[in-house]
A protein has these predicted regions:
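An acidic/histidine-cluster motif and surrounding catalytic segment
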Residues: 1-127, 137-173
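Charged, glycine-interspersed solvent-exposed loop segments at helix/strand-loop junctions
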Residues: 130
Length: 173
């Protein structure tokens, strides 16, 4: 994909583990900043990833995204506070604005991603990339929880975007 076509991205990548224990070391190695940047930018500019609810040619020309990698305690607390679900989930998306600048926070729970990747026999980096794409699509207005049509559309778009990033279809792996 043409790098010049990418929108301006202001990215804050946060690792919520002040103790820097060894469990997070593997995650830091699996998810370098350039991989996060590429996944988000590729999602935003994908030809089919138009911003939902806007004109047919509506795209983000700039984005301000915070990606925070958390432990299970913080992941569960955020999920409880904002979704009334008392467990840590793999990704939470807090979308603030679609236009003129796409603005969102993506929270990924490291232990949940590690467990899911191991259970599903997936590469940890590929699983992170999948959930970054998934969370970015949520920030762009896509939803899979309220209709089967929306879920099918979002899943198909994820697969196309991931293919462009060199990641195998996570729903067939």
């Amino acid at each position: 994909m043409n790098l010049q076509a990418y929108p301006e991205l202001t990215l804050s990548l946060q690792w919520a583990n002040p103790r820097k224990d060894t469990a997070f070391t593997a995650h830091r190695l699996a998810l370098p900043r350039h991989a996060v940047t590429r996944a988000i930018k590729h999602t935003i500019v994908h030809p089919l990833a138009l911003i939902k609810g806007h004109q047919a040619n509506s795209r983000a020309h700039a984005a301000e995204i915070t990606v925070r990698i958390v432990d299970a305690v913080e992941g569960q607390a955020l999920n409880r506070q904002y979704r009334a679900k008392d467990y840590a989930t793999n990704v939470l998306t807090f979308d603030y604005a679609l236009s003129p600048v796409l603005s969102a926070d993506l929270v990924l729970c490291a232990p949940v991603l590690a467990r899911e990747a191991a259970e599903q026999g997936k590469d940890l980096r590929a699983h992170y990339i999948h959930l970054l794409v998934h969370g970015t699509l949520h920030a762009m207005g896509y939803d899979h929880e309220h209709s089967q049509t929306g879920a099918a559309r979002m899943e198909a778009l994820e697969v196309l975007i991931l293919q462009g990033l060199g990641v195998v279809n996570p729903y067939e792996a």
